[in-house]
Amino acid sequence: MVRILTKKSFALSALVAASLMASGAMASDKTEPRNEQYKDKFSKQYNSWHETSESVEITDALEQDPNLVILWAGYGFAKDYNKARGHMYAVTDLRNTLRTGAPKKDTDGPMPMACWSCKSPDVPRMIEEQGEDGYFSGKWYKGGAEIVNTIGCSDCHEKGKSKLRISRPFAERGMEAIGTPFDKASRKDKQSMVCGQCHVEYYFEKTADKKGFVKFPWDKGTTVEDMEAYYDAIDFADWTHKVSKTPMLKAQHPGYETWQLGMHGKNNVSCTDCHMPKVKNAEGRKFTDHKVGNPFDRFEETCGNCHDQSKEFMVNLDKERKAKVKEIQLRAENQLVKAHFEAGAAWKAGATEAEMKPILTDIRHAQWRWDYAIASHGVASHAPDEALRVLGTAVDKAADARVKLAQLLAKKGVPQPIALPDISTKAKAQAALGMDMKKMNADKEEFKKTVLPKWDAEAKKREATY
């Protein structure tokens, strides 16, 4: 029997079909990377997340502390290192930094695809589409037109839901390595684990089967000594230091690891308790504030939930802890800078690899420990005791290297102390290393003018098909 549809029944059928299509699309597990797609259903969270754009100031860490240029000599961070800004700037700042160079095609540039891995919900989208082998292969340029949505909703939440998720397979493997699989964790633990997808120490693998993959070095544990032992066991180095020829380790931002060791972590005060508290909007409705930031900016909703001291007291206590950490940090830097130049002098004087090996091991371990402490941005607040302990061992190991160097330099007939170049400013330190900053900056400006518009146009065309 043939059924004749009236206008009314046809319209109703079309409406039902459209509804089913929409429901089917939302039911898909595929990552939706476009953050604006969530602004209606989760308006309060979306609007507060968007306020991370207010951290407009760019703070040049190399300008503030020129020692860093020498400590990272031969590595990208000696070119450019700004303090972190809000999540809204994750993609922008990675595009603009000198560390990513000025590539003109997908085979150019100093950095691999893995450098995008914590910057965008486009990353899990690409991994879903291409697999990890496809995503991690190639240079950073390859992801330019694909990775355009900054850190947002789908990085931490299942599609269209408030339910938390880990969106990176490498992060899942990391959590499993330390016996805390995400699917078995409590919601309270998950609130920190989603942050631990990115606010962690990681490295890029160099094995043939997983070259360029991101991995957390947690196989032996998550302390500074555990990860140091792991890296030593696999003979891993991020780069060779330009002055001392030390096989170096570059710590990333082990916030999750250091948080666990502090009083907040030990009492299971989560990342969100302090950095994304529950707040009330103008209508009095509670929601999770996604303007990730300083707990002191929302003291009553964060610190005030547990502490009965005043905001002034807590702020001053935090300042005191930061000052103590900074003091030992600078002591470690002073020892390390001298050790690098003294090692360089030893090589020039004819030192052998056998003579230098124990010295370079001390420098490697000292700088790794220093970097582990300072790269964890909030360590003075999260785990001040651990920060001071680790920095103290960095000072000791750097001093051990310098004692051995003094003996070796004397043996080689080299007058001491070794003359050091003027590194009192960022520019002078970079010049001392022979870095052509004028060319690097000019190349980057050309890249921003010619390549970035091309990436954005390609991305817009692709997203129009979603």
Swiss-Prot record:
Residues the record lists as binding Ca(2+): 201-202, 250, 252
Predominant cellular place of this UniProt entry's protein: periplasm
UniProt: heme c 2 binding residues: 153, 156-157, 290
Residues binding heme c 5: 264, 303, 306-307
Binding site for heme c 3: 87, 195, 198-199
Binding site for substrate: 202, 253
Gene Ontology terms describing biological process: anaerobic electron transport chain; nitrate assimilation
InterPro entries tied to this protein: Cyt_c552 (IPR003321), Cyt_c_NO2Rdtase_formate-dep (IPR017570), Multihaem_cyt_sf (IPR036280)
SUPFAM superfamilies: Multiheme cytochromes
UniProt EC number: 1.7.2.2
Cofactor mode of binding and number, as noted: Binds 1 Ca(2+) ion per monomer. Binds 5 heme c groups covalently per monomer.
GO CC annotations on file: outer membrane-bounded periplasmic space
UniProt GO MF annotations: calcium ion binding; heme binding; iron ion binding; nitrite reductase (cytochrome, ammonia-forming) activity
Reactions catalysed according to its record: 6 Fe(III)-[cytochrome c] + NH4(+) + 2 H2O = 6 Fe(II)-[cytochrome c] + nitrite + 8 H(+)
Family: Belongs to the cytochrome c-552 family.
Summary of the function given for this chain in its UniProt record: Catalyzes the reduction of nitrite to ammonia, consuming six electrons in the process.
Name of the molecule in the record: Cytochrome c-552
Encoding gene per record: nrfA
